[in-house]
C-alpha cells in the first residue's frame, strides 16, 4: 500500500517519488539480489489514479494510463516495473488497482479522496464533516473488507491465468456523492446527514475532476474477486467492522 497518499504526494513531490516509486523498486531489487532460486509472489496495491481524463464511461484493464497526479504516475511506474521483473522471472507479480477505500476507519489522512469516507464516518460518530466537492461528483468505491479480500485472493491466485497481463482493475461500486448521502440517510437518518457541511475546496475539486468514475471489471470478476454492490452495504460494513472500535 502507498506510504505517501495522493494529496501529500502532490504537495511533497520528492517524498512521494522516493517512497512510492523508489521504495517499490528497492523491494524488487532486494528480491532479485537473492538469486534465481527465489521468486516470491508479489501483490502490488496499485490505484485507479493511474487513469486520467479523458476516458471512456467504463475503463477496461488495458486502457492506457495517463495519470494526472504525481501519486498516479508513481503507481503507474511501479506497475510497469513489476510487470518487467515478472516477465524476467525475478518475481511472480500481480498488480491490483484498488478502488477508493470507503469507509476508511480512524482519523482522516492526507489523501485527496479522504472526504468520501469522511462524509460517512464523521456523521456516524456524531461529528461534523466537510464536503469539498459538488454532490454530482461520481467515484469508484470498495470497503476495507473487500480490499483485504482482494489482497488475499491475489496472493493465492494462479497467475498463469493472467496470460502475462498481470494488472487488474478491482471490482467496486460507482456512485455519486449525492447517492452516498442518500444511503447515509436511509441507514442512519436525516439528523446524521445534517452534520455534512458543504465547503468547496478548489484544490481538491481539481484533483478529483481528473479521476476515473467507473470501470469494466469482467476480468477480475471472472477470476473470483468480489466487492459490494450497493452503498447501503458499504455503510453497514463500516458499522459492523469499525464504528467506535
Regions found by a protein language model. Give the residues of each.
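Mid/C-terminal beta-alpha module of Rossmann-like enzyme folds, strongest
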Residues: 150, 154-208
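NAD(P)H-binding glycine-rich loop region in Rossmannoid oxidoreductase-like domains
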Residues: 1-19
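Active-site Tyr-X1-5-Lys
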Residues: 53-55, 68-94
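Conserved cofactor-binding/catalytic machinery of classical short-chain dehydrogenase/reductase
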Residues: 23-26, 63, 69, 73-78, ...
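Substrate-binding strand-loop-helix patch
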Residues: 107-112, 135-149, 164-184, 237
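NAD(P)-dependent short-chain dehydrogenase/reductase
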Residues: 83-138, 144-149
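Amphipathic terminal alpha-helices
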Residues: 198-200, 210-222, 229-245
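Conserved Rossmann-fold NAD(P)-dependent oxidoreductase catalytic core, especially the SDR/UDP-sugar
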Residues: 25-69
